[in-house]
Amino acid sequence: MSLLEATLFRGASGVVALHLVDEAVVDRPAGTGVSDHWSVLVLAGAVVAVAVVYPRLPSTGRALLGFIFVPLAGAGAAMHVMDARWNGAHGSDFTGFLLIPAAAAFVAAAVLAVLSRPRARSWPWRIGRWLLTAVVALLLLAFVSLPIAVGVAQTRKPGRSVPESAFATPHQTVTLHTRDGLDLSGWYVPSKNRAAIVVVHGGGGDRRGSRRHAAMLVRHGYGVLLYDARGRGESEGSPNAQGWTWQTDVSAALDFLSQRKDVDQGRIGGLGLSTGADVLLEAGANDPRLKAVVLDGSTSRSLADVRRLKTSDAISGIPYWAVAYGTIAALDQSLPGEPLVDLARKLAPKPALFIASNELGEPVVNRKYAAAYGNPRALWRVDAGHTRGLTEHPQEYERRVIRFFDNSL
């Protein structure tokens, strides 16, 4: 092994470990302590340990390690570059940018490891070994590196400021207090018809992603509460794009609406988008304060969901999602709730409207949810992108959703 190869791998590993420590200690989410991120520090230690033993490994092992680390560093870098593009560089974004040269260094180290094998063997033997290494590397990429990268990205995205000007509808700025001690930032538009809707955004964004839906409801007199889930936007806490920890947030939103003098307690509904739909499906099944729910873009959020769906795509994806969900569970120190199909069964007879787009397998999974709910007619399939029904079919979307809430609340 050359000194250059060792330097490249160890230097890149040091950057990864530095970034993990930066996120877990220096730039950790508001409302959390270092102890809440011990699993990230363990991961940083594991990266350092791999770098220490790296020179002792055979060339094949070194090459595979390099290829495994490439997507991990690359995904982290891409996340911070995109976030900085939309929100401006902040905090751990700066060490996140260093992951770009780190990913390139891992590629270079892997190539050097492949080329460093003894040349005494014949060319056919060497080509065969290279091909075998490539096949194993691709398998590890598909079923280890990429799902781990997905899991890391869904638990590490930092919060960002949300300007008041982002929501043109006249509103009040409010703070929700969760039962586990976090403060969540939100906007509230008082009700004119004694009914109110809590709107829950998708896993990859914040309350700005549900502004158009909120404005639609306001036009028809509904009070609307939209807020940043924990770890998103301006809210405290650690992010979890699968929404496993969001039930306490919804409960805080319902606490807020239950105390409003402009809202009748029996007239509180919910509208969830993507992950927000999964979260409101669970909340609707378990919280009697929520009287009706619109679930726009539910998919799946756990390995149990994937197994229970029993579709060919779901079954083939089990190895991938087992690693991705396992990574999320380890880093966020949380677990998903009941399978969504079971929650759909528990949701009945509470009024529900399932909305499925043409993407992410939504038609298949939502047919199963509506069937478990006991009313296949509760499903509306809209010819649009994921949660883009209101954008691509505004009149029909507004008519269906408002009619549903008018009849249910």
Give a label for each model feature:
Residues 127-177:
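An N-terminal hydrophobic leader/cap segment in hydrolases
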Residues 154, 282-333, 351, 364, ...:
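Hydrolase active-site cap/lid region
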Residues 194-202:
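Short beta-strand element of the alpha/beta-hydrolase
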Residues 203-216, 229, 236, 365:
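The serine-hydrolase catalytic nucleophile loop
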Residues 209, 240-261:
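Alpha/beta-hydrolase active-site loop
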Residues 262-274:
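Alpha/beta-hydrolase fold nucleophile elbow
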Residues 347-348, 353-356:
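Short beta-strand/loop motif that positions the catalytic acidic residue
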Residues 385-398:
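Catalytic histidine-centered segment of alpha/beta-hydrolase-like enzymes
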